[in-house]
Amino acid sequence: MTNLSVNVNKIAWLRNARGGHTPNILELSELIIDCGVSGITVHPRPDLRHITPEDVYTLRELTKRKKVEFNIEGNPYAESNKHYPGFQEIIQIAKPDQCTLVPDSLEQITSDHGWD
């Protein structure tokens, strides 16, 4: 059987573009889970363009409570900055069910290639 994990980055991107807390990533992620998906996926980036470290930790608690998979994708070499603890630190704190390594850079709009 194929499992579906929904990436909620664009929900966070829209929230950040608007400022404030709307749309609410936690509420919409819970709705997505209640529709029957097998997991939630996020891709936190050092520039905080969508998912923030706080979102990661909040969504981790939700996925534990709802008993669905939590997948964090990102560049394992992404270092910390003033507002971002670094990808490896996020993974160590959140302890996702799955971690997908993505070779993207800060200059990329979106991930578009694999590892060489």
Sequence positions of predicted segments:
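Conserved anion-binding
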Residues: 77-116
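Conserved N-terminal beta1-alpha1 strand-loop-helix module at the mouth
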Residues: 1-70, 78, 93
